[in-house]
Amino acid sequence: MANVVVIGAQWGDEGKGKITDLLSRSADVVVRYQGGVNAGHTIVVDDKVLKLHLIPSGILYKNTSCLIGSGTVVDPKILLKEIDMLIDNGIDISGLKISSTSHVTMPYHRILDEAMEADRGSNKIGTTGRGIGPTYADKSQRNGIRIRDLLNNERLKDVIEIPLREKNGLLEKIYGIKPLKLEDILEEYLDYGERLSKHVVDCTRTIHAASKNKKNILFEGAQGTLLDLDHGTYPFVTSSNPISGGACIGAGVGPTLIDRVIGVAKAYTTRVGEGPFPTELQGSINDQLCDRGSEFGTTTGRRRRCGWFDGVIGKYAVSVNGLDCLAVTKLDVLDELDEIQVCIAYDLDGEEIDYFPTNSDDLKKCKPIFKKLKGWQCSTADCRKLSDLPQNAMNYLRFLAELMEVPIAIVSLGANRDQTIVIEDPIHGPKRALLR
């Protein structure tokens, strides 16, 4: 038995969906532990492109249970659309479970999210506008609606009256937006509750029962390390904790239950939305990475900002997550480049530093110090084992592993499942040094 956490080691969009899908073959239970519909992952199965925001990738495997944990925030409208999409594609969703204590994104959360972002003007933080921040804010203020509340008419009416009155006051008086009607929300969300009721469980008890029965549990994070509310580039962050420690809180397990943490990182770096990005590229190479990597957000459709691999944030991710190994994705995107650069340190006000400054004002001033490596200028898309890779591609991977001081377990070379080199299965393989 092995319990593994999969986290993003950059600013999200690292390809966690594919890696989680790959590892789900060996997992009995997959748990999504934080975030909401602001995250998205794309999975390609038999030439079908499936885009999911809430449901774990493991849903594609018939014998794998998939839990949406207590640390998530659930938009039931979008969740039901995902369920319907999976059913239409012939996928069995009987293994889907939703924590009764997950908080619910309400219509006023989405409206307020968009209104507050518009009100920030030039100081916008790049929110997806999906209501995630306001939902987590209500959770912290103990004013939120939970999944269990959607299952009872009187309960929902009782818990929604005060927050709705407060939100309508904000909508009318601050933003000049028409207030929402209690009756309309009750009717809509009670219907959602009825449709979801058969999937609702005590998430923590379910996970601990699986652990007691020696099941393999995979904890799936959303977003990435640098978007963590406490350890990311605040305020340009999400409203939850994507780092590995968030798995314990969001799933309701102790740290001793976790056997291994695997970080997912692109062979280059991307960021969507606002905030400092030291290795960001401009011009033709940026366009090439964006086009070859199809760098457009699954959730927003926004074009992602692209840059060279940043070893400073990589080492930071290793530290705050306690990474045991790494999955490097989209190596094939670099195939046509004759030269590739990797950031090995920053210049901050004339001083060379090799640590990540979590103060966004300092990070804005950081200038990357690069190491240049030779490209391989041939396709890696059909490589299925390390020995198939061009020598310069191997050199590049070894350099990343040495820089981050963590072994590489998986290399992804395209969107399809089979475009992957698995050096070691992080669930079933022995815990040992791999590609260094």
Swiss-Prot record:
Return the EC number. 6.3.4.4
InterPro entries per UniProt: Adenylosuccin_syn_GTP-bd (IPR018220), Adenylosuccin_syn_Lys_AS (IPR033128), Adenylosuccinate_synth_dom1 (IPR042109), Adenylosuccinate_synth_dom2 (IPR042110), Adenylosuccinate_synth_dom3 (IPR042111), Adenylosuccinate_synthetase (IPR001114), P-loop_NTPase (IPR027417)
Keyword line: Cytoplasm, GTP-binding, Ligase, Magnesium, Metal-binding, Nucleotide-binding, Purine biosynthesis
Q: Where in the cell is it found?
A: Cytoplasm
One GO MF annotation is: adenylosuccinate synthase activity
Chief location category: cytoplasm
* Binding-site list for substrate: T298, T299, T300, G301, R302, R303, R304
**Which reaction is recorded as catalysed by this protein?**
IMP + L-aspartate + GTP = N(6)-(1,2-dicarboxyethyl)-AMP + GDP + phosphate + 2 H(+)
Q: Where does Mg(2+) bind?
A: D13, G40
CDD domains linked? AdSS (cd03108)
Name the cofactor(s): Mg(2+)
PROSITE patterns from the UniProt entry: ADENYLOSUCCIN_SYN_1 (PS01266), ADENYLOSUCCIN_SYN_2 (PS00513)
- List all disulphide bridges recorded for this chain: none
- SUPFAM superfamilies associated with the record: P-loop containing nucleoside triphosphate hydrolases
- What does the similarity note say? Belongs to the adenylosuccinate synthetase family.
The UniProt function text for this chain reads: Plays an important role in the de novo pathway of purine nucleotide biosynthesis. Catalyzes the first committed step in the biosynthesis of AMP from IMP.
Q: What is this protein called?
A: Adenylosuccinate synthetase
Task: From the UniProt record, report the name of the gene that encodes this protein.
Answer: purA
